[in-house]
């Protein structure tokens, strides 16, 4: 009886761990402090080049106004892609997923993501959190 309980408990724990790993492959790629004046050279450099198929943007602190974003891939010719992003993100809001077309088989990795924008409606700097999904 004790061995049946032990096996059942082990299976239950392994199923929970398995499903948890599969349910959330999202990773926080980084956080950028947004200045109060419009700036077009805000960059999030990824220390480890990683394959990212889509991203979400979140305003953790303060409201943001964005005027552009680009993704740079680690490739021989420094390929990049302009992203279609919302122009404004309010504090506490998270965008829908924004697809990144790295290539046909999604094998190129992202080395840097750049943003243009600034903080609005606040004397403090807003923070932009970038979440990736592979």
UniProtKB/Swiss-Prot annotation:
Keywords, in A-Z order: Signal
Signal peptide: 1-23
Keyword Signal tagged: yes
Keyword Signal found: yes
Pfam family, one: DUF2541
Entry-linked HAMAP family: UPF0412
Protein family membership: Belongs to the UPF0412 family.
The name this protein goes by in its record: UPF0412 protein YaaI
Gene field: yaaI
